[in-house]
Amino acid sequence: MELLVLTVLLMGTGCISAPWAAWMPPKMAALSGTCVQLPCRFDYPEELRPASIGGLWYFGSPYPKNYPPVVARSRPSSAVHESFAGRASFLGDPTGRDCTLNIARLSEELAGKYYFRGDLGGYNQYSFSEHAELDVWAAPHLEVPHELVAGSEAEILCRVPDNCPPLRPLLTWTGTEELLDPIGKERIEDDLGSKSLLGSLRFRPRKEDLGRRVGCGVTFINSSLSFQADVGLDVQYEPQVVGLWGPTEVVEGSDVELGCEAEGRPAPLISWFRGSEVLREEPGRNLRLLLSNVGPDDGGSFSCVAENRHGRHNRSLQLRVAYAPRAPVINGSLWVVSGDPVSVTCRAESEPAAILTVLRGGKVMAAAIYEDHVTMEMRPARPEDGGTYSCVAENQHGASSTSFNISVEYPPLVLPASRCTAGGDGVRCVCMVNSIPDSSLVFELPTRNQTVSDGHRDFTAAPPGSDGSITGILTLRGPLEPRLLVLCAARNRHGTTARQLRFHHPGGLVWAKVGPVGAVVAFAIVIAVVCYLSQSRRKKGAGSPEVTPVQPMAGPGGDPDLDLRPQQVRWLRGAMERWALGVKEGSGAPQEVTPTSHPPMKPTRGPLEDPPEYAEIRVK
């Protein structure tokens, strides 16, 4: 016999110690007039070692202070409640920890909860909160399907309690003679110690079985008791949707009416659905649905469902709502590196499908006709491809557009406006750089072996330009060095660019700063230098002082070993004369310097108009 293991709440006086436990079925059932045998076992701590073991059963409550009716005691001489006198008996042997209870001649008033209390003598008396609930039936229980639909196989169950060992039930079916292909079967069910005889009747109901009564009868061997239960068959047929009408296409903003007609037994409930959403429902034969000011979300599949308790049937129609394109949605590579491919997809919802165009300015970059998307591709991306684009979607009901920006990342570019300007109190160099992302900018002074960056006292960062350029300003105070060379270097994650800055001398500015006295001194210096150079040429190789021009670094294809001193001497003589007369010099376009090359110098060969920028006097 299978029993349910239950946890125990121990109540009463005396010691409370684990493991006290009791086992019994939580629910029992029996037919009125029969009996029920309630299996029960209990346990207690071994250390108690009681001299005697007994017990009793309460009805309705486990608490002695509530004076519940006593059902049965293990000691037969003890009193019990009059309702159970002669009916209930303590079948188990408490010394063997068996607390089985038997109740005969059951009646409906004996249905309820039964509690066991152990008595080990003295104060060792405990009530278990776990209990068995008894249900007394007047007849077998028939379980009929919620729906008996014509043509569908059905099964009716007849359940009979089988918890009285002296009385074993016998089950028969009644009213099955006219049923189509009836098949009866039986089986025993054991639900946590409570047993039932379960009979099943399978058949295929027809419309003509409507109202037919089918039941089950129960008898017992060696007993005159009998029980009967039956039910009338309510065979119905599922509804049918017989009519459906309404438009299949409308324009956004229109009013729409849909109609549905159905029949069935019983009269069906008619419902209008869009997807799983119920829009309207009423019982009857027909139902109309009104949609006002429809939009794109109101389109789709509309279903009319006719339903009763035995089945359902539906039919659907498709409603299409035409509307102008919605704002296009942009997806793709909106941020790329120069040289990488660009792929941007523009998608727009509309009905019908729209003509999609991607524009930059007035130029068509990509187009698609009657599609829900268009893809623009550029291979490879160039810095000039960055900028604002627009996607336009249009159909016969309207148009819409969305603008988007493509950013092309590229290494720094030093702008032509970058240069150095000499003033009376020093040099001011401006470097302007364009790049994406922004670059870090420094000034390199090779002749001083110095790098000036943001944070240095001679470095000033100007506000970003309207074109996104960044500007760094280098201010060098003091006299202008003849050999001063300034490079602007910029770097971001895509590369490094360096450029020699051109020197710009405002006309007459140097001469104005020098003044008449300075002019006399400068003229004397020029005469001395010219004479000195002439002497040097005559005494070449004799160990006398000589003028040694600084050789420029070799450029691509250049020869750094060429002896260019005569030209440098001639240039120096002309340069000093021009400087003394206040002549502006230093024209020429700035030159780009790659990160791996030396800063380019002016060529040492060629006409005198392109002399080296500087020279030095060295006395041996």
From Swiss-Prot:
Residues 151-233, 239-322, 325-407, 414-495 form the Ig-like C2-type domain. GO terms for biological process: cell adhesion. The keyword Glycoprotein applies. PROSITE patterns: IG_LIKE. It comes from the Eukaryota. Keywords: Cell adhesion, Disulfide bond, Glycoprotein, Immunoglobulin domain, Lectin, Membrane, Repeat, Signal, Transmembrane, Transmembrane helix. It is a single-pass type I membrane protein. Its main location: membrane. Residues 28-106 form the Ig-like V-type domain. Glycans are attached at N222, N314, N331, N405, N449. It holds the Pfam family Ig_3. GO terms for molecular function: carbohydrate binding; sialic acid binding. The chain crosses the membrane at residues 517-536. GO terms for cellular component: plasma membrane. It is found in: Membrane. SUPFAM superfamilies: Immunoglobulin. Residues 539-562, 583-620 are annotated as: Disordered. Residues 18-516 are extracellular. N-acetylneuraminate binds at R117. This is Schwann cell myelin protein. It comes from Coturnix japonica.
